Each structure stands twice: as structure tokens, then as C-alpha cells.
Curated annotation (Swiss-Prot):
GO terms for cellular component: phenylalanine-tRNA ligase complex. It comes from Synechococcus sp. (strain JA-3-3Ab). It holds the Pfam family B5. Keywords: Aminoacyl-tRNA synthetase, ATP-binding, Cytoplasm, Ligase, Magnesium, Metal-binding, Nucleotide-binding, Protein biosynthesis, RNA-binding, tRNA-binding. Belongs to the phenylalanyl-tRNA synthetase beta subunit family. Type 1 subfamily. Residues 39-154 form the tRNA-binding domain. The keyword Transferase does not apply. Its EC number is 6.1.1.20. Binds 2 magnesium ions per tetramer. This is Phenylalanine--tRNA ligase beta subunit. Its main location: cytoplasm.
Length: 825
């Protein structure tokens, strides 16, 4: 944004030099990249009048001019411009003047035998145009009392100005305007702000006219003013100079006014030729519609290009025909020209995301789209429109016929709570309440003290006492800051900017502190080490995924692409894809694990719409003896894969159980008959199983691939509660083993049987293991024969047969009590 200091001084008084102002603005967040002192472009250039212009005696293309510079004797100047003639008021560079635009220092010199005492300048030589056809001509009716001959010509050229080229952060759309920067300067200097006077527009609805807004989110507000009887022509010099300082060229008085309002208020406007709009509409009822493009539509924009429109292109449509890219660029067919007598002035609000997509779909970026993409202030729409109408009537004449409006803007009010204690906690500085009550009102915020603490803010420390530290304000956000000031922390940032970041002292810790990892990070690293210890390689995947047809996935509101339109709900799908990729590349089976976050919609009872959890996932399987001439190929079986997971949990200190899951808890990625829930300490923490055969077939994977996924939160919570691991010495006494066999129903799980055996056998039982399963001849229908080996051992003595038999009999009794089993031994 280019800021004219001459224009800025009309809005707010300040005594800072350009360099001091640039430093002050930089410190409050508006970095000044360049200071352009336009005064140096024409220092020494004065106003002159050509009294006579005679042909040069020795050159056909030169003229010898006598120029009145306000002194007793006219100056003789040799000029080569074809438009040099008597009576012209012109800029004259006197001897000693340096013109940076052409890197020329003026001196008296003979030109073809005639002494020339200066140079009559063109705008190109003054740096105001790229190329000029002749010398510049000031208006013949110039007030010579206000600007006598020989006086400084820079005010007449708009070169009595300094321009600051500054950048603002993306959230400060209000700063892309002169009024926005003037507010900042007023706050910095504590001087009052002088806004341009605006006469509120009073107009009736446009007769026999329709306005249609297809999507109120894409266009929350639209206003159009019909003005008849305008006379399009050149703009006055003051308007041209303001546009030139901002890097814009003058078009005509109507278009220049719309550009001036864009610079002054940050509100883009567009003027349509009303008669041309009616021609486009034909015999249809005059209708302006705001909608997205349809297939096959085209538009010839003001830059002369005929553009094929895309579904993302947001349009202004007249009678069904596109006439402008909304918020980006107008159409050539309805542009304002010297023949225009009636205009339709558009002032609207367009959604930032919609405008960005629309502009990018056509490869365009304009001053208007740049502002819409950041978010034009809701509150300035009516002010900017009325100011534009006022200037058009003043500079181009005409009268207002009518006004059409559509307005679904959100409420232009917001109230926040600000706690002094929170401000001090964030900034680390003892700030007085008086400082807050001086700085925030200077930025336009209204404050009133209260004692209630903001409910959405973190609670105050228990040690905090009432009084100054407990001071709380209710803050009303000005309408022009609604887009970027939404929370208490935003108010703290606003205070810090104006208070001055350079005023905060550097405070070193009073005592040296040893850095350490958090308990959660320490335990997570321990889990990583254990997983690497069982032979798995850690992998990472992006949390984004395609939404596809899965309604349970949490969707991204503004996705980068369809491939990244949702966030993952599990780690296992990504691990399967990683296994497939490595398998396809000939890298062999991937044995890997991943620790990452997963996301899901929260249950209706939860106050939050979404929930996030950290999971541990893994994938393993394939041939255990690849390319080994000594052994035959041997795929990993279910028990080997399960054993690796069990050993990992045991190294972490957990005794795990694997129980059948109900259908609703099963994963569709796993074999329905070869998956189980993982339980520790009475809670289900995840699942384990073999990949579904259909999935392996679709992805051309080996059948023997296994996956698991575990919720880390219960694991970490349990690990964090534990103290030091207590070592139990090995028993030096011999063990006694007993076998037990029985018929059991097929639906009875081994895990449930083992659980009852351990409870019945008591502390003497060291281990229990299934060593035989048989189905077939001799076994009752619907049952199977199971055989378990129980090992008994005491830490302090050799067990007697009586003790072992007593425990074994208790096991038999409890099995018959809990299950419909038939004992065989």
C-alpha cells in the first residue's frame, strides 16, 4: 500500500518526519519497505510562460523560446517539442536542477549556436510518465496569483509529496486504505482523526428493477446506485495527483472516483455504463444477478481478453449475460467511456475465499481482488458508496435516480472481556490499568470496567488477589476491526503494538533451571524404543486424506484439494498404503509402526464438535525367510504377529488379553474371523488382526499381513501413574506341571477360559498354555477338544503333590461351574 503523506495530513495532524513516521509504523506492525521522496524529482523546476517560440536558425526541429520565469528578463530556452508555442504555461528546469528520472543535470549550454538557459520539461522527464509526446502544458486558466510565474512547480505536478510504501499483515485488511493508516497514525500521535465528510445518500428504489443474489454467503451485501446525466471527462489535478502517488493512472472522472474510494476507504467499487447494460439485457426487465458461472459462458474483461469462465468464477450478470468478474474486474462491453451519460455504481461485499478462487481461476489479481481476498470491512460499505456518489455528482454532475440494496451482513457489534492479569501474564510486564485505558480507546475500542471474568478465558490463578490485578474491562470492538479482533488475545496484541514492543524489558530467570522432557513425551519415546526393539520401523503420514463417501470422516472446511479434504480417523489405512507401496517397489514386506493423531466427530453429549486422540498403529507380516537358500519360504502366522505385540506390551509392563470384538467394534480392514480386541487392566485399548482377504486381493498384497491400532492415552495414563518397576527374583525351586483337557463349545473363547483358570489356580500358578486343539471324530458336534498345560511353582519352597492337586481340583471345579465343558482328564 502506497501512502501519500500529503493526503495523510488531511486526515490527521502529525509532526513526524517521513523517516520517523516510517519507523513508528514499522514498530506497530506496518513495515515500510521504501520511502519515495517525490519532491526530489523536480527540485528546481518552476512555473514559466512561453512568450515566443521561433524556429531555430540552425535546426529545423528545434525552437528558440522566450520564457517568462517571473524575473525582469525572460530566459532563452531551446526546445525540441512540437507543441511548444507562445502562451503555454509550462514546467521549466532551471540551471543546476537535477532530474533523477532521466539522470540529467541542467546547465546553460549552446545548442546549435544558441545559448539555452534551462529546459522545458515533459512529464516523462519528471518521472510522471513512461513516455511523453511533448512538453507538459498546465491549464491556461491557472490561478497565477496563487501560483505566480517563477514559483515552485512541484505543487502543480503533485510532486510536493512523500510516499511510504508499506505492507500490512494478512489479517489487517482495514490497513489497505488511507483511512485505516490514518487511524493508526492518530493512535500513535494521540491526535484526532478527520474523516472525509460524507453526506448520507437518500434515494428511492430504482424503478422497474430486479436484484438477485444467488448465494448470500458469497455476496452478503450488494448496493447499486443509478445516476443519470453525468458528463464523463478528465479528472481535476488534485484527483490525478492522488492516484499517481498511489501508482494508478487517471482514466476519467467517474472511474477515478471509484479508484479514489478504493484507496481512501479500502472498499472496491465498479461503475457500469447503464445504457450499455440495458443493451446487454435487451427487452428483458432490467435485472442484475450475482451468481457463479455456468458451463460455456465467456466474458471479455477490461484488459481486452476474452475469458472462458469456470464454475468457480463469481459473476455479475445482466439479463443472463456476464458483465463482470465479481470483485475482480469489469467487462469491456459495459465500461464507462466518454460517451457515457448514465452509470450504475456497484458497491458490494464478496466472500474472501470465493473471490480468491474466482480470481485464480482466471489468473487475475487486481487492487480490488487483493482487498476482497483479505476481507473488506463490513462497516465501510455504505460510507464508501455515499462518498463516491457525492464526488461523482460534484465532478461529473448528474442526479441520483434510485438505489437497490441487498444486505445480509452479520451484526456489526462485538464485545470482549479483557483481564489485566491475563495481559500481564502474556506480556510479562507490569502494565498499569491507566495504560490500557489510554491505548485501546486511541485505537477505537470502547472500555468499561467490570468485575466479571470472561467465561471463555482461562481461570485466574488461585493466588491472584482482588484489586488492580483483578481488573477486568468490557471492550466494544469498533466495526472496522471485526474481522481481526475476535478474542481476548487479540486485544492484548493491540495493546502491545501501541504500548511498544521495545518497552518490554528483558527478564532473565532468577535461578537456572534444567531442561527436561514432559512426562508424556518421555513415555512416548519409551514406546517408540520398544516398537523399534521388536523390529518395526517408524513411519510418518500426513493427517489429511480424501473424504470419499465416508460420512464419519471429519471434513476440512477449505480443503487444498479433493485428496486432502478430510482428516484421518485411523492410522491403519495409511500403514496399509505404505505396505502396498513398498511391496510394489520390490522392497519386500514392510514391518512398521506409526504414532500420530486421529480425529472424529464428538458424541452429541460433548460440548466440543470434534475429538482428537493419539494412536499407535503397526503393520507386519509377509515372508520371514525371503531370499534365503537355506530355508523354504515361511509366511508369518497369526500367533507370531500377536506374539510380537504381546512382547512389546510386556516390555512396557502390561499383561494383555485378546478378546473377540462385537461386529460394531470390528474394523472393515481386518478379517472378521481373525481379529480381536486388545485389553489391558480391564479396558479395551485397541484391536489386532489379519488384513481382510478382499483388501489383500484388491491391493495385490500377500495374505499373511497383520495390523494393530492402539489408543495411546490409556497406555500413557497408566505408565505415568506407575512408580519404579519392582524386580521379582526367580524361584530356585522346581516347578510342577499338570495337564487338563475337556470338550468346550466352539463359541467359547480361549481367552475367557484362561481367565477363569488363572483366577481359580491362585498365586501358585506360574503359566498356562494351550497346547492342543482338536475337532473331528470323537468330539461332540458344535464342540472342540482343548488341552492346557498348567505350571505351578512357589518362590520359597518345593510344592507338594497335595498342594498342586488342590489347585488343580479348584481349576476343574471352576471350569465346570462357569462353562458348559466336559472334562476329559
Amino acid at each position: 500500500m502506497r501512502i501519500s503523506l500529503k493526503w495523510l495530513r488531511e486526515l490527521v495532524d502529525f509532526e513526524l518526519s517521513p523517516e520517523e513516521l516510517a519507523e513508528a509504523l514499522t514498530l506497530v506492525g506496518f513495515e515500510v519497505e521504501e520511502i519515495e521522496d517525490r519532491r526530489s524529482w523536480a527540485e528546481g523546476v518552476v512555473l514559466g510562460r512561453i512568450l515566443a517560440a521561433e524556429p531555430h536558425p540552425n535546426a529545423d526541429k528545434l525552437r528558440v523560446c522566450q520564457v517568462d520565469l517571473g524575473s525582469e528578463q525572460p530566459a532563452t530556452i531551446v526546445c525540441g517539442a512540437a507543441n511548444a508555442r507562445a502562451g503555454l504555461l509550462v514546467p521549466v528546469a532551471t540551471p543546476g536542477t537535477h532530474l533523477p528520472a532521466v539522470n540529467l543535470t541542467i546547465a546553460k549550454a549552446e545548442k546549435r549556436g544558441v545559448l539555452s538557459e534551462g529546459m522545458i520539461c515533459s512529464l516523462a522527464e519528471l518521472g510522471l510518465e513512461r513516455a511523453s509526446e511533448g512538453i507538459h502544458e498546465f491549464p491556461p486558466d491557472l490561478d497565477l496569483k496563487a501560483h505566480p510565474l517563477g514559483s515552485d512547480a512541484r505543487p502543480l505536478l503533485g510532486l510536493d509529496d512523500v510516499v511510504l510504501d508499506l505492507t500490512s499483515t494478512a489479517n489487517r485488511a482495514d490497513a489497505l486504505s488511507m483511512v485505516g493508516i490514518a487511524r493508526e497514525v492518530a493512535a500513535l500521535t494521540r491526535n484526532p482523526l478527520r474523516l472525509p465528510p460524507v453526506q448520507p445518500l437518500q434515494a428511492k428504489p430504482i424503478p422497474n428493477f430486479n436484484l438477485r443474489i444467488a448465494d448470500a454467503k458469497a455476496c452478503p451485501a450488494y448496493s447499486g446506485v443509478l445516476i443519470e446525466g453525468v458528463k464523463v471527462g478528465p479528472s481535476p489535478d488534485w484527483l490525478k495527483h492522488r492516484l499517481a502517488a498511489a501508482g494508478m493512472r487517471s482514466i476519467n472522472n467517474v472511474v477515478d472516483v471509484t479508484n479514489l474510494i478504493l484507496l481512501e476507504w479500502g472498499q472496491p467499487l465498479h461503475a457500469f455504463d447503464w445504457d450499455r447494460l440495458l443493451q446487454v439485457m435487451g427487452k428483458k426487465k432490467p435485472t442484475i444477478e450475482v451468481r457463479f458461472a455456468q458451463a460455456g459462458e465467456t466474458l471479455k474483461t477490461l484488459d481486452g481478453q476474452t475469458r472462458t469462465l469456470h464454475p468457480e468464477s463469481h459473476l455479475i450478470v445482466a439479463g443472463g449475460q456476464p458483465v463482470a468478474l465479481a470483485g475482480v474486474m469489469g467487462g469491456e462491453e459495459t465500461e464507462v467511456s466518454s460517451a457515457t451519460t448514465s452509470i450504475f455504481l456497484e458497491a458490494a461485499l464478496f466472500d474472501p475465499v470465493v473471490t480468491r478462487r474466482s480470481a485464480r481461476s482466471q489468473g487475475l489479481r487486481t487492487e480490488a481482488s487483493a482487498r476482497y481476498e483479505r476481507g473488506v470491512n463490513f462497516a465501510t460499505l455504505d460510507l464508501a458508496r455515499d462518498r463516491a456518489v457525492q464526488l461523482i455528482l460534484e465532478l461529473a454532475g448528474g442526479s441520483v435516480v434510485g438505489l437497490t440494496t441487498f444486505d445480509q451482513r452479520p451484526p456489526l457489534e462485538r464485545t470482549l472481556k479483557l483481564r489485566l492479569s491475563r495481559l500481564i501474564d502474556v506480556l510479562g510486564e507490569e502494565v498499569r490499568p491507566e495504560d490500557v485505558e489510554e491505548i485501546l480507546p486511541a485505537l477505537g475500542f470502547q472500555l468499561s470496567r467490570c468485575q466479571a471474568v470472561a467465561p471463555e478465558a482461562p481461570p485466574l490463578p488461585a493466588t491472584e488477589t482482588a484489586g488492580v490485578a483483578g481488573c477486568v474491562w468490557q471492550v466494544s470492538v469498533p466495526p472496522y476491526r471485526l474481522r481481526d479482533v475476535e478474542r481476548e488475545i487479540d486485544l492484548i496484541e493491540e495493546f502491545a503494538r501501541l504500548y511498544g514492543y521495545d518497552r518490554f524489558s528483558e527478564t532473565l530467570p532468577t535461578e537456572p533451571q534444567v531442561g527436561s522432557l514432559s512426562a508424556r513425551e518421555t513415555l512416548t519415546r519409551q514406546i517408540r524404543e520398544v516398537m523399534r526393539g521388536i523390529g518395526l520401523t517408524e513411519v510418518y503420514h500426513i493427517s489429511l486424506c480424501p473424504a470419499e463417501e465416508d460420512s464419519s470422516l471429519v471434513k476440512i472446511a477449505n480443503p487444498l484439494s479433493p485428496e486432502y479434504s478430510a482428516v484421518r480417523k485411523a492410522l491403519l489405512p495409511g500403514l496399509v498404503e505404505a505396505f502396498r507401496f513398498n511391496w510394489d517397489q520390490g522392497n519386500g514386506p514392510l514391518q512398521a509402526f506409526e504414532i500420530g493423531h486421529v480425529f472424529a466427530y464428538a458424541p452429541p453429549s460433548s460440548p466440543e464438535p470434534y475429538q482428537e486422540a493419539e494412536h499407535l498403529g503397526g503393520i507386519l507380516g509377509g515372508d520371514l525367510n525371503p531370499n534365503d537358500w537355506r530355508h523354504h519360504s515361511r509366511p508369518m502366522d497369526w500367533f507370531e504377529a500377536k506374539g510380537l505385540l504381546v512382547s512389546a506390551l510386556e516390555r512396557l509392563g502390561f499383561t494383555s488379553e485378546f478378546r473377540p470384538d462385537p461386529p460394531e467394534a470390528q474394523s472393515p480392514l481386518l478379517h472378521p474371523g481373525r481379529q480381536a480386541g486388545i485389553w489391558i487392566e480391564g479396558s479395551r485399548i485397541g484391536l489386532f488382526g489379519q488384513l481382510h482377504p478382499r483388501l489383500c486381493q484388491e491391493k495385490d498384497l500377500p495374505e499373511e499381513v497383520y495390523g494393530f491400532e492402539v489408543d495411546l492415552d490409556p497406555l500413557l495414563a497408566s505408565l505415568e501413574k506407575r512408580g519404579l518397576v519392582q524386580f521379582s527374583p526367580f524361584s530356585p525351586f522346581p516347578a510342577s506341571d499338570r495337564d487338563i483337557a475337556f470338550f468346550a463349545p466352539l463359541e467359547l473363547s480361549v481367552a475367557d477360559i484362561e481367565k477363569v483358570i488363572r483366577q481359580a489356580a491362585g498365586p501358585l500358578l506360574q503359566s498356562v498354555q494351550l497346547f492342543d486343539e482338536y475337532r473331528g471324530q470323537g468330539v461332540p458336534p458344535g464342540q472342540r477338544s482343548l488341552a492346557f498345560r498348567l505350571v505351578y511353582r512357589a518362590p520359597d519352597r518345593t510344592l507338594t503333590d497335595a498342594e498342586v492337586e488342590a489347585a488343580q481340583n479348584q481349576v476343574r471345579a471352576q471350569l465346570e461351574k462357569h462353562f458348559p465343558v466336559t472334562l476329559r482328564s
